[in-house]
Design a protein with these regions (language model features):
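Helix-coil modules at protein/domain termini and other flexible surface or pore-lining loops
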Residues: 2-191
Length: 191
């Protein structure tokens, strides 16, 4: 490691080494929660929504909305290491006292019409001041738009799941979250 680090610093050409491709999310779970605070959103109601969802101990990173074909849904792990990085596809709605806030995620799998193999998945997130029915309609419309604009000719969209969370805060601030959380990854070795 020291020799490699010294070579990198000197800009000398490296001999050998492992070339790894972009990692691919392999396993995930879905969770949701709500939180309220009299103090603030980010260190208040949002954090308490993460706690309600059971992921408050993690450092959250958000992704865009694609699931690889190898991804598999699992149960939430019993333990998440405090301070671990948790990569998610997340919907978050924040609001004030008396204001309905709703967050949701919808996902479906693209199945190759010719082979029957699972190609990958699409995920859409949405949040706002919606009733659950309004939120569900927006999520369905978003997923349909993604599917129609790039995938419907070759793939069927199947196994659709929707997860929602909503809250009308009684305290000054309120948050609702839904998160698809990745727990493991495949690292392709290229050379």
């Amino acid at each position: 490691l020291v020799k490699t680090t010294n070579r990198l610093r000197s800009n000398a050409p490296l001999q050998g080494g492992l070339i790894i491709g972009n990692r691919i999310p392999k396993e995930y779970f879905v969770t949701k929660g709500t939180g309220e605070s009299e103090i603030t959103v980010h260190a208040g109601s949002y954090h308490l929504a993460l706690k309600s969802a059971g992921i408050e101990m993690a450092n959250i990173i958000t992704y865009s909305s694609i699931l690889p074909g190898i991804a598999k849904k699992i149960h939430k792990p019993k333990e998440i290491i405090h301070g671990a990085v948790m990569e998610t596809i997340m919907a978050v709605a924040n609001g004030h006292k008396g204001e309905l806030v709703s967050a949701g995620i919808i996902n479906g799998w693209l199945i190759d019409r010719e082979t029957g193999h699972r190609y990958g998945g699409l995920v859409c997130e949405h949040n706002g001041n919606y009733t659950l029915k309004q939120l569900e309609n927006k999520l369905e419309a978003s997923l349909n738009e993604l599917y129609i604009n790039g995938f419907e000719e070759r793939y069927a969209l199947q196994n659709i799941e929707m997860h929602t969370s909503s809250l009308t805060p009684r305290k000054e601030y309120g948050s609702a979250i839904v998160a698809l959380c990745f727990t493991s990854y495949l690292y392709p070795i290229l050379a």
